[in-house]
Structures are given as C-alpha cells and as structure tokens.
C-alpha cells in the first residue's frame, strides 16, 4: 500500500510478497520510456462463476484480479505475474510510474528521474511529459527526455549511475556502493603531482633548517619547533599525494550537451 513515507525508489510490493518472479526485461538494455499508471475503474463486474464480485484487469498480463476485501488498498498484486496494479489514485503530490521491467514505482509529481530498485534492472528512468493512459487505450510510451547529466561507470563496483555535473575531473559518490571516485583521471593526477611537489619542498626546507641551525638550536631550543613543522607539513602532503594517487577513477559512458 503506497504511503507518503515510502521510499520513492522502492517497489510498491515488497520482495516478501513478490515470489521468485523476475522482471520480464533484462538489465541494462536500451532504455524504454516509462509510462504513467492511471488507476483503472474498479466497479463491480460479474466474472464467470461469481456474481457481483469486484475484479480488475492486471495492467501487465491482463489477468483478472479479485478485489474482494482489497478495495482499501492503493495497489493490488496479480496472482499470475506477481506485478502490482494501482486501483486508487496515488497520494497527494505523488504519481505512479511503471518501469520497463514492469516494476510499479511511486515518486513525486515533480520528479524528473527515478531509479528502479530491482537488483537485475537498476535502470535510471528519465521522466518527461507523461501521457495518462485510460483503461480503454493501449499503453503508449511517454515522450523521451534528453538527459542533462552523464552516465558514469563506477570505478569500484562497475555499476552505471547518472552524474549531474556537466564537467569532468570532479569527485562523485556512487549510489550503489556509496564509495567516492574521481570522474576522469586528470584531477587526481594534478593533485597528486602538486602534493608531491609541496611535500618534497617542505622536507628539503626541514633538512636545510636542521643542517643550518644546529649550533643555533643548542642555545635556543625553540628552533626544534620549526624543524618539526617543516617535516610534519611535508609528511602530510606526501600522505595526501598517496591518497590522490590511489583513488579509483570512474569513466563516463556518454556525454550530453
């Protein structure tokens, strides 16, 4: 049952009730446009063998779904294909969207992108002007929308995610593995070289102070503080250089204007 507190990226039917049925569309295929789900009418229809029992057609396989005792729910599950079909309008400010893998999602009216949570789908769906589908009309795809970001392949887990920065050489956090990587290799290379240079300069300064102020330091012990500061700055810069030299790099798949 859809509610305001439900995560917009999660399917409306939990995995515990969905059985072992997998989506009909394989992952990472050419993305089809999503379609808006308008709840069909659920007036009582006399189905064969029953009288006056409310039923509805599944929006995926067109099988009849018995609504007896379920009219208080927002969505119902088909017993044939185990996919969700809405029977009520979504909560205020929300809308239904069906992924090409047939997973029914709920998101905000103003959302422009939504991710399918199914492990073997993980599509990033770009939402554009939605065509409302009536029960009498066949499902029609919505108009495709030009993405404004870049598809990036994570350097840690290899999954693809949408990066909204229009420039490369930035740090990105993968929504799948939650790890940080650099989009492009120019940024870590520049920073690694810069930190190595600064670190070596600080160490050379520390060595020069150590050699040049040995006699002076025997009388003024505060000179040791300047040695320590120079060596410490050099060590910190070299550690940062190691970090930037070892950071994983994520590469863009496609660029969009």
Curated annotation (Swiss-Prot):
Phosphoserine PTM sites in chain numbering: 33
TM segment ranges: 192-212, 227-247
Chain positions of motif CX5R motif: 107-113
Location in the cell: Late endosome membrane; Lysosome membrane; Cytoplasmic vesicle, Phagosome membrane; Cell membrane
One example of a Gene Ontology biological process annotation: phosphatidylinositol dephosphorylation
Catalytic site positions: 107
Region annotated Disordered, chain positions: 1-43
Modified-residue entries (Phosphothreonine), positions: 22
Keyword vocabulary terms for this entry: Cell membrane, Cytoplasmic vesicle, Endosome, Hydrolase, Lipid metabolism, Lysosome, Membrane, Phosphoprotein, Transmembrane, Transmembrane helix
GO molecular function: phosphatidylinositol-4,5-bisphosphate 4-phosphatase activity
Catalytic activity from the UniProt record: a 1,2-diacyl-sn-glycero-3-phospho-(1D-myo-inositol-4,5-bisphosphate) + H2O = a 1,2-diacyl-sn-glycero-3-phospho-(1D-myo-inositol-5-phosphate) + phosphate
Segments of skewed composition (Polar residues): 13-23
Record field: compositional bias (Basic and acidic residues): 1-10
EC assignment: 3.1.3.78
Membrane topology category: Multi-pass membrane protein
Matching PANTHER family: PHOSPHATIDYLINOSITOL-4,5-BISPHOSPHATE 4-PHOSPHATASE, TYPE 2 PHOSPHATIDYLINOSITOL 4,5-BISPHOSPHATE 4-PHOSPHATASE
Protein name: Type 2 phosphatidylinositol 4,5-bisphosphate 4-phosphatase
Organism (species): Rattus norvegicus
Gene designation: Pip4p2
